């Protein structure tokens, strides 16, 4: 067996494959958001603000 570090090993070696997977994932996931683009946009904003937790000082 070839040595791979963790689950993302294949993507680390093949960025194009990772990019494809990201695109496909984005298209197929979030079924609820397809019907409500505004809700998806709000969720994206909230997610961006809250990730990283301590940076905003609001926890």
UniProtKB/Swiss-Prot annotation:
Family per similarity comment: Belongs to the con-10 family.
Extent of Basic and acidic residues compositional bias: 1-23, 36-45
Regions of compositional bias (Gly residues) in chain numbering: 46-59
Gene Ontology BP annotations: bacterial-type flagellum-dependent swarming motility
Disordered: annotated segments: 1-59
Protein name per Swiss-Prot or TrEMBL: Uncharacterized protein YciG
Recorded superkingdom: Bacteria
């Amino acid at each position: 067996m070839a040595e791979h570090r963790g689950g993302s090993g294949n993507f680390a070696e093949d960025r194009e494959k990772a990019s494809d997977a990201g695109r496909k994932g984005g298209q197929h996931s979030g079924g609820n958001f397809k019907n409500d683009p505004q809700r998806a946009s709000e969720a994206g904003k909230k997610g961006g603000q809250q990730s990283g937790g301590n940076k905003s000082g609001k926890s």
